[in-house]
Amino acid sequence: MSRPQQITVLGATGSIGLSTLDVIARHPDRYQAFALSGFTRLSELFALCVRHLPEYAVVPEAGAARNLQDDLRAAGLSTQVLVGEEGLCQVAAAPEVDAVMAAIVGAAGLRPTLAAVEAGKKILLANKEALVMSGALFMQAVRKSGSVLLPIDSEHNAIFQCMPQDFARGLSNVGVRRILLTASGGPFRQTPMAELAHVSPDQACAHPNWSMGRKISVDSASMMNKGLELIEACWLFDAKPSQVEVVIHPQSVIHSLVDYVDGSVLAQLGNPDMRTPIANALAWPERIDSGVAPLDLFAVARLDFEAPDEERFPCLRLARQAAEAGNSAPAMLNAANEVAVAAFLDGRVRYLEIASIIEEVLNLEPVVALDNLDAVFAADATARTLAGQWLSRNGR
């Protein structure tokens, strides 16, 4: 019997990480957690180490590492604790590792994910910011290393399942007319426009269908998440922004569709549970049980669709503009959004000001080419500085 595949889970204490470990635990003969990383919920990381017995755990700083190492030793575990970005890159690229779940939220996940790519690992990509920030460089690294890149976002995983196997030859060459990227519309789809100025972080995080972390929940409410997914889809499937159409589908049962030139439209359906795309990517090209209940079409009963209102969701408009501009624009969009959303969650800015901050940053800074990773992080830093200046200027 062959050994279980060794899986590094970057962002193990987040919702994607926990769902990944749930799927892994259902198939101990196939998968073993090799390394787990956590950022803030370190008591939870300790509990995960006790349950899954990884070779390594990674935490952000040395003090936390000492505390976790002491706790693990006291529990009789041999798990070794590593520190910071260097530790993340080490467990992402380790020779023993077969696949890496890249689920660290935001720009912080880029370097470890690239380390896994350059080491030729199978990449389960949940960190959409990695592609948004450095799309051309990232895909170039994938091609150079021969790494297998499998999307975890439910929408991109759905598109992947609906695409022909040889879609890398170009969408027009395989008969694809367009990608239909579905969105729930979030908690504010029908909120009166006058009330949006006063919505709270808790309201923004109350997603009607999905259980997610707070940052991505706010992105879903503003539809910036869908904008980032539009950019990600362009890189994953070599599509032009004009070939990706966003469709609001409140039930979140159809996770995305692919429209073919012969009039066929293929869709992937399922209950809104991230274990489905995770299991699909872990086992690809095979299929395994994810623990997700079968879809009951009779209970769903109806499927609704509508066009997104860009006045209600200006972040979607800004993301499409950044996708069309290319180069540094998506990286700056992402960085400005991260600063603005953090300020909103801290109660320093209002919900509608998130888009205002992003738009100002994009208008202030010219678009430049990103020829290397240093240029990517320079664009990221510039956008964060400009967003911070907006906060300071407005007394936030």
UniProtKB/Swiss-Prot annotation:
Superkingdom of this protein's organism: Bacteria
Sample GO molecular function, one term: 1-deoxy-D-xylulose-5-phosphate reductoisomerase activity
InterPro entries the UniProt entry points to: DXP_reductoisomerase, DXP_reductoisomerase_C, DXP_reductoisomerase_N, DXPR_C, DXPR_C_sf, NAD(P)-bd_dom_sf
Enzyme class: oxidoreductase
Binding of 1-deoxy-D-xylulose 5-phosphate, residues: K128, S154, E155, S184, H207, S220, N225, K226, E229
Record-listed NADPH binding positions: T13, G14, S15, I16, N127, E129, G213
Binding site for Mn(2+): D153, E155, E229
Enzyme Commission number, as recorded: 1.1.1.267
Cofactor: Mg(2+); Mn(2+)
Pathway(s) per entry: Isoprenoid biosynthesis; isopentenyl diphosphate biosynthesis via DXP pathway; isopentenyl diphosphate from 1-deoxy-D-xylulose 5-phosphate: step 1/6
Record family assignment: Belongs to the DXR family.
Protein name: 1-deoxy-D-xylulose 5-phosphate reductoisomerase
Source organism: Pseudomonas fluorescens (strain Pf0-1)
Lineage: Bacteria, Pseudomonadati, Pseudomonadota, Gammaproteobacteria, Pseudomonadales
Gene (name only): dxr
